């Protein structure tokens, strides 16, 4: 990955966290943005949020205009990428893998 793209994703992650914190919705204020992946042309960004509630995605979609406006004002950029919000389930996957590895370790210990 090139350094410019990494820097853009890092800046966008910080700006999105600030944008969510500035909203008047308590559910959106408490969301954590875990990762941002920008497309090759940087016209589109996938924003991964930590939540177990699928309803939060519709709230984020409704607030996308305000979020993009905040990012533009705070960054001074000419354009803001289109944002697609995705629930981040990497923590759940990691916990499942840890449980599997623990079971394997217990099985080897009994042999």
Swiss-Prot record:
Its main location: cytoplasm. One of its GO terms (biological process) is maturation of SSU-rRNA. It comes from the Bacteria. It is found in: Cytoplasm. It holds the Pfam family RBFA. GO terms for cellular component: cytoplasm. One of several proteins that assist in the late maturation steps of the functional core of the 30S ribosomal subunit. Associates with free 30S ribosomal subunits (but not with 30S subunits that are part of 70S ribosomes or polysomes). Required for efficient processing of 16S rRNA. May interact with the 5'-terminal helix region of 16S rRNA. Belongs to the RbfA family. This is Ribosome-binding factor A. The gene is rbfA.
């Amino acid at each position: 990955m090139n350094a410019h793209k990494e820097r853009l994703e890092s800046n966008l992650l910080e700006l999105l966290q600030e944008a969510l914190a500035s909203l008047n919705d308590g559910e959106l204020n408490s969301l954590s943005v875990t990762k941002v992946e920008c497309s090759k042309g940087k016209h589109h960004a996938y924003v991964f949020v930590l939540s177990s509630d699928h309803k939060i995605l519709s709230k984020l979609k409704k607030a996308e205009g305000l979020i993009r406006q905040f990012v533009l004002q705070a960054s001074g950029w000419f354009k803001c990428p289109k944002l697609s919000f995705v629930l981040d389930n990497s923590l759940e996957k990691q916990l499942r893998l840890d449980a599997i590895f623990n079971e394997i370790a217990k099985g080897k210990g009994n042999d």
